[in-house]
Amino acid sequence: MEERGSPDGDPARNLEQGPEGSETPIQVVLRVRPMSTVELRRGEQSALHCSGTRTLQVSPDVAFRFGAVLDGARTQEDVFRACGVKRLGELALRGFSCTVFTFGQTGSGKTYTLTGPPPQGEGVPVPPSLAGIMQRTFTWLLDRVQHLDSPVTLRASYLEIYNEQVWDLLSLGSPRPLPVRWTKARGFYVEQLRVVEFGSLEALMELLQMGLSRRRSSSHTLNQASSRSHALLTLHISRPTSQQVPPVDLGEPPVGGKLCFVDLAGSEKVAATGSQGQLMLEANSINRSLLALGHCISLLLDPQRKQNHIPFRDSKLTKLLADSLGGRGVTLMVACVSPSAQCLPETLSTLRYASRAQRITTRPQGPKSPGVKPPQQVENELLRLQEENRHLRFQLDQMHTTAPGAHGARMAWAQRNLYGMLQEFMLENERLRKEMRQLRSSRDLARAEQRVLAQQVHDLERRLLSACPLPQQGSTPVCPCRMVPAASCHALPPLCYCHHFCPLCRVPLAHWTCPRRECHMPQVLEPEAPGHISQSVWPPPWAPPPSPGSAKPPRERSQSDWTQTRVLAEMLMGEEVVPSAPPLSAGPSNMPYGLRGGSGIPNLTPRLETLTQQINSSLHLSQRQPQPSEDTQSPGQGLSSC
């Protein structure tokens, strides 16, 4: 048979051992309500069987074990004694934080267990035999306070969590939702919550009845008085002593204990209860908060929960129960179930929930008074201060043995070193920025200079063409000479007399001399110059062609004309464009413009050299031309066959 849950004993005996400083498990008491009149009419039988005082039998194979198991025949007084609430009250008087909360399905008797049956009318008290845990605890607590030697201050607060909003059930003004805050000293608390001080049982009962009358409830198929909200009533107990001083921080709570009673709304299935509209929204909100509570309980059971994040902030309910579940308080859980077989799925869920909850352990902490310390703590603090004093004296002696000012000098040197490195980095950054600006400026100047040089080359070519007028169309026949396939159309001197021009730039094309005219063209041979290539005696390409009707040979140019042409060519080649800014220092100062300031135009220098060679070749040819005789054949007569 599978048996779940193994508590160490009943709550009363466990709490007698003293919870302070040790791990204390959450105590769970199970109560099975009796069969209702409707269930008896349907002929249902109980699906749960209590085997002794601590075991609940669900089936022959499944059983659950808790601190105490109470069947439907137990009275309210039996439940109060079995839960050990008196011991929780004693711990609250000693300054501990104690919590009692009920959990279970809707209609399982949670509110009845805590507060008894609802009042039959206004001013009609509940019979003493039917009073719940809260009324019995109030009666016992006030009687216990009267027999104490020191005065005790009692205060009460009452709130409900409805649709994830906190409402004050004791508020004197108009009801409004209150925020939940968190501080390191107090943990989670409700801001602006009214706390009422009382001194008698009658005053406390009036506060309880006021809260119960304001609490929201409704009816559905499973419960005629179903609570639609979670309710928390807290009793604050403070016992001032002669050594006690008020807290320094106004956010800190007063020194003392508290006793909190939590009546959770029951979990329900909308399909089973038939809830619609507002009831369905309330059921969803209730189930969502209970699901968050179950998730926190599951994470608290993890052995490595110190490394896990417990999501107490997922709902307002888990925020206010964070200290009771996983903090420094003592917690008692009363699980209420229904014996009906129709509610068996929800009953099993509640049993598993309670079985997991009783395995959660807390570390209760007693009251912390800022003016009073235990003797053991004072002795430990004294030993710690003595050890710290010896350590500081040893460090002081070590500082005296070293050179005076050495530590300060090292610190100053380190600071200066860091400051110097920072200054160097800043200067280097500024230098790089300036160099980048200079490079960009030089790049722009080089591009401008390249454009100027390209324009200069273009002007030189145009001026060269202007010195070589085109022959009139139809004046001379087409020359049948063969063109040399060169990469550049005007890169191979010397030129033939028949002028071929580039169709694009109109520059005379370089080609071999006409083979049909070689026999008729007069040549000047100089055998004394070996390796010398014979040149044509005809005028240069830029000379004007003879007119068709003229029989005279072209006029020979004088030496002064050729000198003037040479001077003109040197002037053309010597022109230089002065840039608006100094060029880049990328090469030597005597480097041609096409190579300064970075990459220039690739064909600029060869084109200039080609023009220079053409002009020099023509000038050289004209100087070596002999004086024409009268019997020499005129050039105009030799053009008849071309």
UniProtKB/Swiss-Prot annotation:
SMART domains xref list: KISc (SM00129)
Record region (Disordered): 1-25, 531-561, 579-642
Compartments it resides in: Cytoplasm, Cytoskeleton
Record domain Kinesin motor: where: 25-360
Keyword set includes Secreted: no
Compositional bias annotation for Pro residues: 538-548
PROSITE patterns, per database record: KINESIN_MOTOR_1, KINESIN_MOTOR_2
Keyword Phosphoprotein listed: yes
Coiled-coil spans in chain: 376-465
PTM annotation (Phosphoserine): residues: S6, S369, S634
Binding sites annotated in the UniProt record for ATP: G104, Q105, T106, G107, S108, G109, K110, T111
Bias-annotated ranges (Polar residues): 610-642
Comp. bias regions, Basic and acidic residues: 1-13
Keywords annotated in UniProt: ATP-binding, Coiled coil, Cytoplasm, Cytoskeleton, Microtubule, Motor protein, Nucleotide-binding, Phosphoprotein
Gene Ontology molecular-function annotations: ATP binding; microtubule binding; microtubule motor activity
Protein name, UniProt field: Kinesin-like protein KIF12
